UniProtKB/Swiss-Prot annotation:
Signal peptide: none annotated. The keyword Cell wall biogenesis/degradation does not apply. GO terms for cellular component: bacterial nucleoid. InterPro entries: ARFGAP/RecO, DNA_rep/recomb_RecO_N, NA-bd_OB-fold, RecO, RecO_C. This is DNA repair protein RecO. The keyword Cytoplasm does not apply. Involved in DNA repair and RecF pathway recombination. HAMAP family: RecO. Disulfide bonds: none annotated. GO terms for biological process: DNA recombination; double-strand break repair. Keywords: DNA damage, DNA recombination, DNA repair.
């Protein structure tokens, strides 16, 4: 069976003398594994479109164990990402996230579109990286079915409290009367709550110029990191560690 679909290259591994094994996040088939035969030959028609991050259009043959790339045309190479180590590291973090949370063969059109928009934003030189990455994280959790409750207490639905905490296990805010519902819940400021709501509700293209303080970014980053860990069991994102040192 042949299918034609757009997709992003998440991973490219050498196989044999001239072949490549690809992990592709596609619009029509979700995350797939595919072999690109002869793709590493210098004159291969597939070579340009199978580089990491590439957004390409593929003609794929579905075999018993994996797909075979019959044709591939690069639509966007994302050269600016490759020329800036910090942007490259954050883009690699997004790839790690998507690969960690997606299931082979399961489509997620909203996540596919979000991933594409975010990569296109990261290649621009005049954007604020931190709010874009935080927006991607919180929207990703929403699209996986873990939308955090940020408008009221997840336990009693109260909208008022002396101080909020965020419970990764309960999936949202806890008011001061409900702290006992999760003894490991993390303190979260009212400003961070408002920022999280903004990032969750707005299209990611609307946050590209948003400026947030390092303190606020760090607060929300820690909370989202715990939230992602709780629901994906993925903690060690090497690319994020590299990006944050730059």
């Amino acid at each position: 069976m042949l299918i034609t679909t757009e997709g992003f290259i998440l991973k490219n591994r050498k196989f044999g003398e001239t072949d490549s094994i690809l992990t592709i996040f596609t619009r029509k088939a979700g995350k797939i594994t595919a072999i690109a035969k002869g793709a590493r030959r210098p004159k291969s028609n597939l070579l340009a479109g199978i580089q990491p991050f590439c957004y390409s259009e593929f003609v794929l043959y579905k075999g018993k164990n994996m797909y075979t790339v019959s044709q591939c045309e690069a639509k966007e190479i994302f050269y600016p990402l490759r020329e800036d180590l910090k942007r490259l590291s954050y883009a690699s973090y997004l790839v790690e996230l998507v690969e960690a949370v997606t299931t082979e063969g399961q489509t997620n059109h909203r996540l596919f579109n979000l991933f594409g928009k975010t990569l296109f934003l990261l290649k621009k030189s005049d954007i604020e990286i931190n709010p874009i990455v935080r927006a991607f994280e919180i929207k990703l959790m929403n699209y996986l079915g873990y939308k955090p409750q940020l408008m009221s207490c997840v336990n009693c639905d109260s909208k008022e409290t002396t101080a909020w905490k965020f419970s990764a296990t309960e999936g949202g805010l806890l008011c001061s009367s409900c702290y006992s519902a999760d003894l490991f819940a993390m303190k979260i400021s009212n400003t961070a709550v408002k920022l999280a709501i903004f990032l969750l509700m707005k299209d990611i293209t609307e946050v590209q110029k948003l400026k947030i303080s390092d303190h606020l970014n760090e607060e929300l980053k820690k909370i989202l990191k715990q939230y992602i860990l709780t629901h994906t069991n993925k903690y060690d994102f090497k690319s994020l560690e590299v990006a944050e040192k730059l």
